[in-house]
Amino acid sequence: MKIISNILLTLSLILAGLAHAETPEKKMITVGAQWKIGPSTAYWIVAKEKGFFENLGFEVNIVGIMGSQANLSALQSGQVDLASPQAFTLAKARAEGFKAKMIMCYVPKPQLGVVYHRGRGIKSPLDLEGKTLGIVAGSGEALLLPMFAKVNGVSVEKIKVTQLSYGVLNGMFFEGKLDAMTTFMPYLPRFLSDGHKVAAFQYEDYGIYFNGITGTEKFLKENPITVRRFVRATQKAFDWIYENQKEAVDIFYKVQPELISDDHQADYDQFKLVMSTQYDDISRKKGVGWMNDSKWKKTFKFTEDNFDSKINFSTSDIYTNEFLRQ
């Protein structure tokens, strides 16, 4: 009996130890979305409303943050535990000494492109030569323009590029003062719904990463269970959303009815464009969020070419797949 009692005691201690080992380190985490909460970030709201973040052992608070640099600033200041910067913005910050890693890239392809007026002789990208194109200097869509031009045999020097602010760009375009503009592609269905006679060229996958869940090295090291549970729940959520896009849109607008447009089909089309960039060749094989060295090295080159940054670190210093489903 004494032997059995000792065995049972040992087993209970082992089980207790295992249970303790799997206890999340945090009671709540705050996660920054890459933009304000709206159609382009609807999947975060849907994931929460659908229950993917329940039973994790901690609360998940999603906040909208306007842009990549603001995401990094919030992460650096501790306003959020995890953020969603663009990969090249993160690489620039890492080159400047900020130690953080991307742990799930959920935008591995650009959500950007060129929108143009129909009836102005633009049928292919080559027709942009000689036309007036509005851009916001330093924006992702502007930085990718040379790649888009090169792939399509277009000379950027032959395009009449006009640099404007976001506050002015759309107005000038829809007033007809510009032939085309670089923009966030999911806006296109809304433009069409509003009656604008426009079309677009969407940027292709140029081999660089965009937005992804990112944490400081310190936070990732101190909270591995919390991070792993959140990331894997997010993977499951994104997979479900991708397969159930109409239901996902309905869930989002039930929570945010003030954002619904008069043309609900445009809402569906907008979300479809957002979700079309969630998977690349790597993530289709391995799962949403997965990254590899090759694409990160191209992201490094893009960063050096556009941000006057010197990449003095390895790919293992800026990303990891360890928290993803294996």
Q: Where are each of the predicted segments found?
A:
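Short, glycine-/small- and polar/acidic-enriched structural segments
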Residues: T23-E175, D179-M185, H196-F201, G207
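Bacterial N-terminal signal peptides
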Residues: N6-A16
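Sec/Tat signal peptide C-region and signal peptidase I cleavage site
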Residues: G17-A21
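Conserved C-terminal helix/tail region of periplasmic/extracytoplasmic solute-binding proteins
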Residues: D293-Q326
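Phosphate/pyrophosphate-binding betaalpha-module
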Residues: P189
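Secondary-structure end/capping motifs
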Residues: E222-N306
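Periplasmic-binding protein-like
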Residues: Y106-Y116, L192-N223, V227, V231, ...
